[in-house]
Amino acid sequence: MRVSGQSIIAISLFTLSLYIHRVQARPFVLVLSNEDLNGGFNDNGAYESSDFDEFGESEPKSEEELDPGSWRRIFETNESTVHASASPQYYSGLHKILSAASEGNTTLMEEAVSEIDSSASSGDPHAQSVMGFVYGIGMMRETSRSKSILHHHFAAAGGNMQSKMALAFRYLRQNMYDKAVELYAELAETAVNSFLISKDSPMAEPVRIHIGTEENKDALRKSRGEEDEDFQILEYQAEKGNSVAMHKIGLFYYFGLRGLRRDHAKALYWFSKAEFNGLGYLYVKGYGVDKRNYTKAREYFEMAANNEDPSGHYNLGVLYLKGTGVKKDVRHATKYFFVAANAGQPKAFYQLAKMFHTGVGLTKNLEMATTFYKLVAERGPWSSLSRWALEAYLKGDVGKAFILYSRMSELGYEVAQSNAAWIVDKYGERSMCMGVYGFCTDKERHDRAHSLWWRASEQGNEHAALLIGDAYYYGRGTERDFVRAAEAYMYAKSQSNAQAMFNLGYMHEHGEGLPFDLHLAKRYYDQALQSDTAAKLPVTLALASVWVRRNYADTALVQVLNSLPEVHQKVVEWVENGMLEEVVLDPVGANVAQPLAAPVAFPQ
């Protein structure tokens, strides 16, 4: 069968929906036991295969149906979609909120919030969603958790998807998985449907704008298209036969990404070399060929899988789950889905979430189902907020970036939580943080940053917990509290943060917030060195201090050590410089927060 160049590009763009929208999340390792597999429904006739998705087919829906009240209309003036469900007053107020944040205009912000409040009182669910945000952060209104939840409930009942995200995240934080899983399941389904009509760049991923306490200059350079070294590496991989790299190179040329000029001829060249999976799709659906041929489809999917294309693994999983052209085998399907999920294929996460949710193929586990649904839901149309926030930040519009990241924080995005917290810490008054009566007071800024860092730490951001501990230890924005500092360091230590281990050792050595215990101090210092060899110098000095205290207690030498409180600050700086939060480099060169593609331990 000959496939035209136009068809190949169409296949490639279609497979985008199955392949290139990689799920971004905090690093995690999933270990499956035989109990996970054997506890589920493995009787191949005991479930309705129609309940599970097929090969990317979905009923076409408009963006208004998928994300009613979308903020896109504010940022893209050529938006053709008419948002009939949202009132003009809502969009007017929303536009003023963003303008006020950019300009640092508290008068305009008060006017904007009043306008949104009026629209919400008239029953507009999208205005109610914004008021939920307003009460949640205390912007021109007194902070009220109850009013925030109430507004989000009304908004969600009216169809606002962002409020459903906010409520789902609240339920998740309270371990109310029975409620969270239902909302995230709906949101994930919407996200999957949106992949086919997404107007965003397929490579747009949440970018962490900071590394530790410093700006993430490498990531920002790449976001501006100023770095091409990683592209050269990717091109080299493509030339060596890596089909995943071929597909990405094709997308770069087709969309003109990463500073490249659009070149459809080059895009076609790379797509035609990579699209085994797309050809398999044509055969399984019978598009452009004489008739459906499941044997041929399976052969192409297997070739795609052999070329490390996660969509090939995903579609093989669908064949076995559905029993299409092969004997139905849910256990075999599960294995393929896990391989695809480890490669970042979002629909594979969606299928696995359904399996954990329903108990088909895997032991029913609402916590795991919720986690996987959330990963997919965060790739929905509302994820465009991240791109607009980054664009604002790159243009120097810190106020707009801060309010957009703050909105995303409420929806449960960890990267947005840490970005917003970092902005308010780094820029202070220049963050344009708006409080109850105008610009945020020092206390309001501290409380806002503390809340954001804490949420990020709950989702696995170890540096966030460390910063909370530092704030309490040094009295930054709050009164010094060694006990709370120790609690925060303990939390960061539980996430294997070496600097937190070092700090706990210091606190035990000096009896600050923790019992004076040189044995425990040495243990924590040793753990810090085991976790990160970059800590060798500060740990060596700290261990020397412990040795002196143990062998020369009540001597002048110990008194000299105690008279040098500034030594700890210097040591902390050394440790911090050597233990900055790790950043995962995607082969594409997008310095983004993303899964480490940790291997799944699958029982044989």
UniProtKB/Swiss-Prot annotation:
Quote the SMART domains the UniProt record gives. Answer: SEL1 (SM00671)
Q: What does this protein do?
A: May be involved in the endoplasmic reticulum (ER) quality control system called ER-associated degradation (ERAD).
Regarding protein family, the annotation reads:
Belongs to the sel-1 family.
Keyword terms of this UniProt record? Glycoprotein, Repeat, Signal
The GO annotation for biological process reads: ERAD pathway
Q: Where are the Sel1-like repeats?
A: 125-160, 244-274, 279-307, 311-344, 346-380, 464-492, 498-528
Q: Where is the signal peptide?
A: 1-25
In its UniProt entry, the species of origin is given as Arabidopsis thaliana
Disulfide pairs here are none
What's the name of the protein?
ERAD-associated E3 ubiquitin-protein ligase component HRD3B
**Carbohydrate attachment sites?**
N78, N105, N293
User: Does the record carry Nucleotide-binding as a key word?
Assistant: no
Give the span(s) annotated as Disordered.
48-69
Q: Which PANTHER family match?
A: ERAD-ASSOCIATED E3 UBIQUITIN-PROTEIN LIGASE COMPONENT HRD3A-RELATED (PTHR45084:SF1)
